[in-house]
Each structure stands twice: as structure tokens, then as C-alpha cells.
């Protein structure tokens, strides 16, 4: 059976060759225009050359004239009977090319000559979508005048022209489409990922999709696009399949002016997404996320926020609306960069609060704002890690983001700890659970065997003597041992069970031993 396949293939190719030889006209005119030989092309047209003779891939002289952005050549071709309603084997048409290069003159010539006003490609992408993507409002207006379907949906991602305009920050096009009755609340296709597990196995976050035009505007930061959509009665709180609202989207993308506008227009600040992230949590998360850092397995990220509204303003605004200051995550939030951020910000898992999130980053400003609004100072995550334990350095791993922050990390930690202690944080609170089934589901590897440890273990792990001294001065006990029977000093001298924390430091050893003598 295998031996017959080459013979069959040869026969098919021979048949195609015979067919092609008889069907394809002389493409010399198309070749000349493609080569940019305008003078020769005009002479050929005047001499009666076949103006519809296509190249092997179906591209006609008219398509190449459009590509060359040549209105005069197009006019000559159309006058000789060139077909405007034609596509090549790639699904490209003269009209799609004219819209792509944003030449209104070419577009009008083609429409008047009978071009298909939709001219979709193989994925159903219409020329109105191209105009929306480019921000070509006059071309979009012309297409609509000739009957373009304002609500056409392409088949690849289920997106509309309105979504493209909002995503590319073209408010004038958004206004035009809304005025022409574009559906403002239709959502793009969503991926119902049955499993997000690799062969390792490990969960890997994959975006679900299902965004509306307002969500695209929120993601791109186009505040005027959002205003136009809201004026067209877009649902300000309509979430994605993951529960992410336009407000969450704006905050998550550092668009604080837009987020503020959404709240002023009635966006609900009491929503939460699949992971349990509320607008307050995301605002604190973005405030605590440094503008420049090394991403896990990724490049350095440099973010410049130009909005007049600061992230701290958004935290205060959301809190002023009366939201719960202590929402807790359902699970580890999706990672920036498309993965679960294994080994990065390990404590931001089930039960994490905005205060814990701020404490992980030693973000004293956010901590102070939250405490002023009665955030619970000792509310822990599922493992029992409190904000004070987190601020002291607990949850270390080789890829932890904290050593990548700029500036004096011990100074940041101390500023945060002072606020937490002043608010009544328990300096001897212990990690409660890293071994139960529930804890293991949420537990990162860096927290293995840390059950029973206190905040004092954190600076010992890092070698932060100033932080250790602060905790000792505020009542931290040296005689508490973890579930493996090791105290803070044991970690310095012997390391832990996994040998992660073996950091011999003479100054720290002396500090802990002296404190142990004093307390006994």
C-alpha cells in the first residue's frame, strides 16, 4: 500500500499541472505592476492586455496596483474592466489591501466598482475590522455607508470591529460604530480549558478570553473609548468567564485614570474574580509591584505610568466606597507572563489579603493605608502566614522577587514592621499549617517544613540582622522551635531539612545567642 502512494501523488501533480497550464492566463501585467514597472504596465493596459490575468496564487493586476498605492493605475485598470470583487488564494482582496494602507481614494474607487464591502479573508476578518484596527474613521464611515455589517464576527477569536477599535485605542471609530448600532456587550470567544496541566504535571495559567469591547478598552487604557461604550449602554460590570470585570482589567494594566472613571460611572468595587481578587486586592497588588524588576524566567520589566491618578489614590478611593478591607484569595492568582509564577511571591495563595500582599513587598505606604481602614493585622493565609511574618522575610526561594527590589530591603522591611507592630501584630505568631491536604494544595515548595516557624525565622533566613534585632526588641522569642524541632539558631548553624536555609552568619549567631541568654 505504501509503494502506491508516490505513484498516486505523481499522477495528481501531473493532473494539476495540465489543468494549471490550460487555466492560468498570461500574468505579465501583474508581474510588471508587482515589480514597480509602472510605465510598462500603463502601456500594456493601453495595448489591450488582459487586466484580470492573475498570477499563480490568484493575485490580479488590480491587487498589485492597490499594493503599490497607485490611484491612477487603479483607475486605468478599472476603466478597462478589471474586476474589483476578487480574492487571491490567501484571501486578500484589492479592497482589503486599500483599507490596510488606509487610502480613502482607492477604497472609494473599489467600492464604486462593485467590490465586496465585507471582503472577508479565510478567517472572516472583514475590511471594516481592518479600518477599525487602523483607526481609519473616514474609511469605516464609507464602508458602513455601502452596507458593511457593523456586527460581523471573525471566526478565529470571535472578535468584532468594535473590539478591534477599542483594543487599538481609536475612540472616534468606537463612537462611529456605536452610533451605527454595534453590539456593545458581545464577548469574544472564550477558551474552556478542561485542564491546565502539563506532563510534569503542574498547573499552567492560560488566558480564557471572552472579553467585551469595554474590557479591551480597559486593557488598552483608552478612556475615551470606554466613555463612548458606556454612552452606548455597555454593561460596566460585565465580567469575563473568569470573573474579571472592566474595573479589574483597568487596574491590572495600570490604567488608573480609567479605573477611577469607571468607579465614578458606577462600576461595582465589591466584585471578585475566579481567584478571589477584588479591585482592592488588585490595586494593592499593582502598588506593591515594582516598576522595574526581573520577571521569573523573563526579561526585565520597565513600566512607566503616566496617569494623573496614582495607584495609592485608587486604593483610597476603593476603600472609601465601603468595601471589605480584608478579602481573601481563593487560590494563587494568575502569574504575570502566562505561567503560575512558581517560586515567585509564594505567599500570595489561598487566604492572602491585600494587607498580606503589601507586606510581602514591604510596601509601607499601602500597609499604612489599609491599617487606617481597619484591615485585620494578623489575618493569615491558609498556611497561617500573617502580614508580619511575610514582611520579616518568610517564604524565601531562589527566585523570590524581594531581593530584586531596588533600595534598602531591610529598611523597607523595618518601616513595614513598625506599622504592623504598632497596629498590634503578634511578633510570635506561628506558621500554622504546611502539612494538611488543604495547605499542601496551596503550599509552595519554599514553605515546606516551615510549620511552627515565627517571624524571627525570616530575617535569619535572609541574614537581616537589623530586622532580627527589631523583632527581638519587640518581644520575639528565641526558644520557639518549628515542627521539625529546629529553632532560629539551628537554621543558621545546621540548615533546615531541605538544606535551603544554611546561612552561617557570625553577627546573626551572636545576636540570637545574646537574646536567648537575656530572655532566660
Region annotations inferred by a language model:
Residues 31-35, 64-70, 97-103, 130-136, ...:
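Ankyrin repeat A-helix N-terminal signature
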Residues 55, 88, 121, 154-155, ...:
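Ankyrin repeat boundary/linker residues
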Residues 58, 91, 124, 157-158, ...:
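Start-of-repeat signature of ankyrin repeats
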Residues 9-18:
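Bacterial N-terminal signal peptides
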Residues 45-50, 75-83, 108-116, 141-149, ...:
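Ankyrin repeat domain, specifically the short helix-to-loop turn at the C-terminus of the second helix
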Residues 24-64:
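N-terminal segments that cap or nucleate solenoid repeat domains
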Residues 478-516:
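Leucine-rich solenoid repeat scaffolds
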Residues 40, 72-73, 105-106, 138-139, ...:
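Conserved ankyrin/ankyrin-like repeat signature
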Amino acid at each position: 500500500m505504501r509503494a502506491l502512494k508516490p505513484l498516486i501523488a505523481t499522477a495528481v501533480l501531473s493532473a494539476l499541472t495540465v489543468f494549471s497550464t490550460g487555466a492560468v492566463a498570461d500574468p505579465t501585467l501583474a508581474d510588471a505592476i508587482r515589480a514597480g514597472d509602472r510605465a510598462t504596465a500603463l502601456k500594456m493596459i493601453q495595448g489591450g492586455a488582459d487586466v484580470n490575468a492573475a498570477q499563480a496564487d490568484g493575485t490580479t493586476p488590480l491587487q498589485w496596483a492597490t499594493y503599490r498605492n497607485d490611484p491612477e493605475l487603479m483607475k486605468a485598470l478599472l476603466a478597462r474592466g478589471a474586476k474589483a470583487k476578487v480574492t487571491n488564494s490567501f484571501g486578500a482582496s484589492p479592497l482589503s489591501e486599500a483599507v490596510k494602507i488606509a487610502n480613502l481614494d482607492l477604497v472609494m474607487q473599489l467600492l464604486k466598482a462593485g467590490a465586496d464591502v465585507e471582503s472577508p479573508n479565510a478567517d472572516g476578518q472583514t475590511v471594516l475590522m481592518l479600518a477599525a484596527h487602523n483607526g481609519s474613521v473616514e474609511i469605516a464611515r464609507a464602508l458602513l455607508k455601502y452596507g458593511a455589517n457593523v456586527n460581523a464576527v471573525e471566526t478565529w477569536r470571535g472578535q468584532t470591529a468594535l473590539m478591534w477599535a477599542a483594543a487599538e485605542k481609536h475612540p472616534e471609530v468606537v463612537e462611529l460604530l456605536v452610533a451605527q448600532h454595534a453590539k456593545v456587550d458581545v464577548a469574544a470567544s472564550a477558551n474552556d480549558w478542561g485542564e491546565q496541566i502539563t506532563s510534569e504535571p503542574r498547573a499552567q495559567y492560560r488566558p480564557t478570553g471572552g472579553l467585551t469591547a469595554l474590557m479591551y478598552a480597559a486593557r488598552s487604557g483608552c478612556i475615551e473609548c470606554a466613555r463612548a461604550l458606556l454612552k452606548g449602554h455597555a454593561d460596566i460590570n460585565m465580567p469575563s468567564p473568569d470573573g474579571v470585570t472592566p474595573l479589574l482589567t483597568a487596574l491590572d494594566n495600570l490604567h488608573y485614570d480609567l479605573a477611577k472613571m469607571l468607579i465614578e460611572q458606577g462600576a461595582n468595587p465589591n466584585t471578585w474574580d475566579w481567584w478571589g481578587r477584588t479591585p482592592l486586592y488588585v490595586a494593592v497588588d499593582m502598588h506593591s509591584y515594582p516598576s522595574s524588576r526581573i520577571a521569573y524566567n523573563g526579561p526585565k520589566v520597565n513600566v512607566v505610568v503616566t496617569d494623573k491618578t496614582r495607584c495609592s489614590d485608587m486604593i483610597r478611593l476603593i476603600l472609601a466606597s465601603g468595601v471589605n478591607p480584608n478579602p481573601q484569595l481563593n487560590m494563587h492568582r494568575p502569574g504575570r507572563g502566562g505561567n503560575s509564577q512558581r517560586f515567585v511571591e509564594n505567599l500570595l495563595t489561598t487566604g492572602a489579603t491585600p494587607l498580606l500582599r503589601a507586606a510581602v513587598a514591604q510596601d509601607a505606604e499601602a500597609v499604612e493605608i489599609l491599617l487606617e481602614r481597619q484591615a485585620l493585622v494578623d489575618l493569615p493565609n491558609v498556611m497561617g502566614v500573617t502580614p508580619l511574618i511575610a514582611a520579616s522575610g518568610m517564604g524565601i526561594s531562589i527566585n523570590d522577587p524581594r531581593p530584586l527590589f531596588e533600595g534598602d530591603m531591610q529598611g523597607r522591611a523595618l518601616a513595614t514592621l513598625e506599622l504592623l507592630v504598632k497596629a498590634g501584630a503578634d511578633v510570635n505568631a506561628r506558621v500554622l499549617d504546611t502539612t494538611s491536604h488543604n495547605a499542601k494544595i496551596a503550599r509552595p515548595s519554599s514553605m515546606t517544613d516551615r510549620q511552627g516557624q515565627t517571624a524571627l525565622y525570616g530575617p535569619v533566613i535572609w541574614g537581616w540582622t537589623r530586622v532580627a534585632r527589631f523583632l527581638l526588641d519587640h518581644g520575639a522569642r528565641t526558644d520557639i522551635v518549628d515542627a521539625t524541632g529546629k529553632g532560629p539558631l539551628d537554621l543558621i548553624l545546621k540548615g533546615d531539612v531541605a538544606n535551603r536555609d544554611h546561612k552561617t552568619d557570625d553577627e546573626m549567631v551572636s545576636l540570637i545567642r545574646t537574646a536567648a541568654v537575656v530572655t532566660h
